[in-house]
Amino acid sequence: MSTMGSWVYITVELAIAVLAILGNVLVCWAVWLNSNLQNVTNYFVVSLAAADIAVGVLAIPFAITISTGFCAACHNCLFFACFVLVLTQSSIFSLLAIAIDRYIAIRIPLRYNGLVTGTRAKGIIAVCWVLSFAIGLTPMLGWNNCSQPKEGRNYSQGCGEGQVACLFEDVVPMNYMVYYNFFAFVLVPLLLMLGVYLRIFLAARRQLKQMESQPLPGERARSTLQKEVHAAKSLAIIVGLFALCWLPLHIINCFTFFCPECSHAPLWLMYLTIVLSHTNSVVNPFIYAYRIREFRQTFRKIIRSHVLRRREPFKAGGTSARALAAHGSDGEQISLRLNGHPPGVWANGSAPHPERRPNGYTLGLVSGGIAPESHGDMGLPDVELLSHELKGACPESPGLEGPLAQDGAGVS
């Protein structure tokens, strides 16, 4: 590639790195600040964001360095080349975990709290990262081209003894990339996710039809299910974009491996597919902001407070049970009951059991405003009734005139 082309590639990669870091730091920041977003599903979202941050901080600089073909010891070059595979694998495992989490939430919601806990989610995330390093760094254990003789293709006459011209395809064997990396650990998980989301949508469609056939359909259950479907659609979009960004590069690798007599893909096309794969680390925050209201509102508050320096106290969206703190005239705590279940909301807006996680119906990711401590079957009628009771008990209290009372679903 020409010098101008190299500079264009490097400039685009650096821009992607900056956007990936800023956008995904914003995602982690939002989950940390907003209690409505602190749920099991978003643990996996944060893991996905961490992988995308690492792409911007490490993988893209490594890719730029490798593109220069600098001289290095073969195993040093191999580590640079394989590190991006670790991050790709972590992203795939996070997406698969999210898909399974949503499947459980819709298919067996009553067992969700028992099956999907914060402790288990953190353990699964740790296992996913360990497996990602094991899979991505497998070439370091011997499945590589470093054992080829010096006159082999991965050695440059301009490099010293024991050094190679550090280029990805010259140190990472293509059979590893195609059979092991792509077929086993990219394509299979993507197909599993496709099947999971298909079953989610079919199950949701069947349940909605059953509700329509009931003489007195439950509006709360219907609204909850619609919010779950909305969340599943948002996450399915993220999976689709991942496939769109990564499949072109893997398809080129397949052509290179299975058709050695065919001409190799032009260098500009290789760089274009590499840039496209790295672009995937940028898009997820935009999907969250566009599709999930709670993320969008929190992003806006963070930008106003910390970027534009417009000081305002951070408060979670007015749609959570945490935010339903009411005070009497003498400052005493008012005990609230939602559908006969005390949610444990205190006068200062905190809950006595912050470690409790929502069931499949009330994830902050789903509704963009349903609280982690709220009861799973609380719907708009309950909220309106509670609002009237609060107003009667303490007129100075803001009650529930926030977004939930206004548009109910809490979904953009």
UniProtKB/Swiss-Prot annotation:
Ranges that cross the membrane: 8-32, 43-66, 78-100, 121-143, 174-198, 235-258, 267-290
GO BP annotations listed: adenylate cyclase-activating G protein-coupled receptor signaling pathway; apoptotic signaling pathway; eating behavior; G protein-coupled adenosine receptor signaling pathway; inhibitory postsynaptic potential; locomotory behavior; negative regulation of alpha-beta T cell activation; negative regulation of inflammatory response
GO cellular component, one term: plasma membrane
Chief location: membrane
Post-translational modifications: Ubiquitinated. Deubiquitinated by USP4; leading to stabilization and expression at the cell surface.
Disulfide bonds listed in the record: 71-159, 74-146, 77-166, 259-262
Region (Disordered): 392-412
Listed CDD domains: 7tmA_Adenosine_R_A2A
Swiss-Prot/TrEMBL keywords: Cell membrane, Disulfide bond, G-protein coupled receptor, Glycoprotein, Membrane, Receptor, Transducer, Transmembrane, Transmembrane helix, Ubl conjugation
Molecular functions per Gene Ontology: calmodulin binding; enzyme binding; G protein-coupled adenosine receptor activity; identical protein binding; lipid binding
Extracellular side: 1-7, 67-77, 144-173, 259-266
Pfam family for this entry, one: 7tm_1
Recorded domain comment: The cytoplasmic C-terminal domain is necessary for targeting the non-ubiquitinated form of this protein to the cell surface.
Family per record: Belongs to the G-protein coupled receptor 1 family.
Purpose of the protein: Receptor for adenosine. The activity of this receptor is mediated by G proteins which activate adenylyl cyclase.
Complex and partners: Interacts (via cytoplasmic C-terminal domain) with USP4; the interaction is direct. May interact with DRD4. Interacts with NECAB2. Interacts (via cytoplasmic C-terminal domain) with GAS2L2; interaction enhances receptor-mediated adenylyl cyclase activity.
Protein name per its UniProtKB record: Adenosine receptor A2a
UniProt organism field: Canis lupus familiaris
